[in-house]
Amino acid sequence: MTSITHAELGWNEVGTPVSDQFDDVYFSNVNGLEETRYVFLKQNLIPERWQEFDRRRFVIGETGFGTGLNFLAVWQAFNDFRRANPDATLKELHFVSFEKFPLSKQDLIKAHQAWPELAELAEKLHRHYPPAVPECHRIVLDNGAVTLDLWLGDIKDCLPSVPYGEEGIIDTWFLDGFAPSKNPEMWNQDLFNGMAKLARSECRVATFTSAGFVRRGLIEAGFAMKKVKGFGTKREMIAGCMETRQQQSRHAPYFNRTSASHLDSIAIIGGGIASAALAKALVQRGQKVTLYCKHAQAAEGASGNRQGAVYPLLNGNHDGVSRVFAPAFLFARQFVEQAAQALTFDHDWCGVTQLMWDEKSTNKLDKMLSGNFAPELIQKLSVGETAAKIGLPIDMASVHYPLGGWLCPAELTQALFTQLGTLDNFTAKFEQSVEQLIWDERSQQWQVHTQGQHDTYSAVVIANGHEFQTFSQTADIPLGQVKGQVSHVPATETLSKLKSVLCYDGYMTPVNPNNQHLCIGASYDRRHLDTEFDVNAQQENAERLTQCVPNQAWAKEVDTSGNLSRQGIRCVSRDHLPFVGNVGDFSAIKRQYADLPHTQAEEIEVISQFPNLFCLLGLGSRGLSSAPLMAELLASQICNDPLPLPVDVLEELHPSRMWVRKLRKGKAITEL
């Protein structure tokens, strides 16, 4: 993986942070906040444009996050705008920024002490400031009114990874960073061209420098630029707007992602954590959402367990699943922490400890550790450190996820739906089994058919887990179904000492003090797709622990003989990644891509997909760690907002990816 290095800072005589890497200050020694307001807000005409803006979300791009001063300043200005203009069309601010050398959290907090007027906003940022993990970190603030996408890594690598459609995504660019003379590697034509590709047709740009090659480079990229008066004693700076934008998309035609068109109502089918997180993300965006759940209450399916572990799925190369689950886990923690401010549900960020219980698991975990991840994300523990961390004697080393923990998914899911139920733009229809989805070409609406009746919606999301085959549109998606049984174990004096989630060839949670039980599990049964109690699975759950931890008496105290348990059916994918996005028209795709290997790239048609039909499926056994970000991704796509993952990672989540992979190789799709 590409490791991220924190900024190395010094502090000058007036308390301004100075980069050791670039020998330059992060902001003006005199008044950095006023300079930000002058250079980036005033010269980009931000206040005037917000008054006239005709879309819900205004997107700002920034080339160097640094201390986050520009972000905090524009956030403050946006709050002032919202208070003064409650009826404005513009409701949301989205800030996309890049940083090669992020400040440590401690340095960030110290830098922000220079601006007491920003302290309240800065504290909200500190709460969710990410560890040094590559690529995009989405931070949702003020109940969705403000979103920060912080891309960690070299901008020359990150900028080509940002997904965008034909219209672009950026309304205004803040071209900021260390002075061109101090950081010549960043200031080049590739940067200016990349900014132009992401820009919308009315995009504006401003920068503190007046260097001639910067102005000429931006003009070459398609911006009309001019010199204007600089801030304070600076004579000049440059500002301008997009003049000639090329219509293009970064999505490959066979992995195309489209937003919902003519959006006025959305139906979500499903009642689990994925549906709850998606409904919340859409409602925050002002959408009218109706939920259909076949059960009498939410979380009756795979999201109904008492305790589930929350931790990332990583690998040493930081590819595939790792590039999805690292940011997804961090977003899930943010999501849960924000939910806990208003809702009551059992959870504990006690950490997760994964035992090196045999040679195979040791090799696998050592390989994962070779990825050089930030210590806030994962640490290796010795035998003694492991025993101290879990609170029980153990004779094996481990890896520890200090930010991990457990939560009660049933309580969280139900609490989210209860909260949503108080809002005017959310309706839940429980005990409503959707039987059929029919697209009405004349009205351009989906008919959602339940027992003997139907309602119409402009868009539909299928998020019903293992029951995805209910509908003809998703029946051919190559997903699997696996039964799992979790055993509920009464606490003993010794087992109550466990103070971290423990993973081996299974998992065990600490005792929940509210019910004096812990959970162990979970079985993996592909043959019996029911929710009946399985006495063999109950016994095997206990045996897996004693087989992996054979030398400790406490492992034998786990008593499953009371047959207390819960069964559910997971919806799983072969590559361990969810299916998120537009639902493909399988029959049409087979026809249009029948000769895909021999088709010239420029002649490849955009993949056939059902209009305004989306899915959020295949979350498997890691749904608690992935559901919030996958829901945020899909809500962003539906609403045509910037997407929170690199474009090649989005391809690995595309619902049609397995069909496309086979067709690109010239293989017939008979069975996946």
Curated annotation (Swiss-Prot):
<keyword id="KW-0808">Transferase</keyword>
<dbReference type="GO" id="GO:0032259">
    <property type="term" value="P:methylation"/>
</dbReference>
<dbReference type="InterPro" id="IPR023032">
    <property type="entry name" value="tRNA_MAMT_biosynth_bifunc_MnmC"/>
</dbReference>
<keyword id="KW-0489">Methyltransferase</keyword>
<dbReference type="GO" id="GO:0004808">
    <property type="term" value="F:tRNA (5-methylaminomethyl-2-thiouridylate)(34)-methyltransferase activity"/>
</dbReference>
<dbReference type="GO" id="GO:0002098">
    <property type="term" value="P:tRNA wobble uridine modification"/>
</dbReference>
<keyword id="KW-0285">Flavoprotein</keyword>
<comment type="similarity">
    <text>In the N-terminal section; belongs to the methyltransferase superfamily. tRNA (mnm(5)s(2)U34)-methyltransferase family.</text>
</comment>
<keyword id="KW-0819">tRNA processing</keyword>
<dbReference type="Pfam" id="PF01266">
    <property type="entry name" value="DAO"/>
</dbReference>
<keyword id="KW-0963">Cytoplasm</keyword>
<dbReference type="InterPro" id="IPR029063">
    <property type="entry name" value="SAM-dependent_MTases_sf"/>
</dbReference>
<dbReference type="InterPro" id="IPR006076">
    <property type="entry name" value="FAD-dep_OxRdtase"/>
</dbReference>
<dbReference type="InterPro" id="IPR036188">
    <property type="entry name" value="FAD/NAD-bd_sf"/>
</dbReference>
<dbReference type="GO" id="GO:0050660">
    <property type="term" value="F:flavin adenine dinucleotide binding"/>
</dbReference>
<dbReference type="GO" id="GO:0016645">
    <property type="term" value="F:oxidoreductase activity, acting on the CH-NH group of donors"/>
</dbReference>
<protein>
    <recommendedName>
        <fullName>tRNA 5-methylaminomethyl-2-thiouridine biosynthesis bifunctional protein MnmC</fullName>
        <ecNumber>2.1.1.61</ecNumber>
        <ecNumber>1.5.-.-</ecNumber>
    </recommendedName>
</protein>
<dbReference type="InterPro" id="IPR017610">
    <property type="entry name" value="tRNA_S-uridine_synth_MnmC_C"/>
</dbReference>
<dbReference type="InterPro" id="IPR047785">
    <property type="entry name" value="tRNA_MNMC2"/>
</dbReference>
<keyword id="KW-0274">FAD</keyword>
<feature type="region of interest" description="tRNA (mnm(5)s(2)U34)-methyltransferase">
    <location>
        <begin position="1"/>
        <end position="243"/>
    </location>
</feature>
<keyword id="KW-0560">Oxidoreductase</keyword>
<feature type="region of interest" description="FAD-dependent cmnm(5)s(2)U34 oxidoreductase">
    <location>
        <begin position="269"/>
        <end position="672"/>
    </location>
</feature>
<dbReference type="GO" id="GO:0005737">
    <property type="term" value="C:cytoplasm"/>
</dbReference>
<dbReference type="InterPro" id="IPR008471">
    <property type="entry name" value="MnmC-like_methylTransf"/>
</dbReference>
<comment type="similarity">
    <text>In the C-terminal section; belongs to the DAO family.</text>
</comment>
<keyword id="KW-0949">S-adenosyl-L-methionine</keyword>
<keyword id="KW-0511">Multifunctional enzyme</keyword>
<comment type="function">
    <text>Catalyzes the last two steps in the biosynthesis of 5-methylaminomethyl-2-thiouridine (mnm(5)s(2)U) at the wobble position (U34) in tRNA. Catalyzes the FAD-dependent demodification of cmnm(5)s(2)U34 to nm(5)s(2)U34, followed by the transfer of a methyl group from S-adenosyl-L-methionine to nm(5)s(2)U34, to form mnm(5)s(2)U34.</text>
</comment>
<dbReference type="Pfam" id="PF05430">
    <property type="entry name" value="Methyltransf_30"/>
</dbReference>
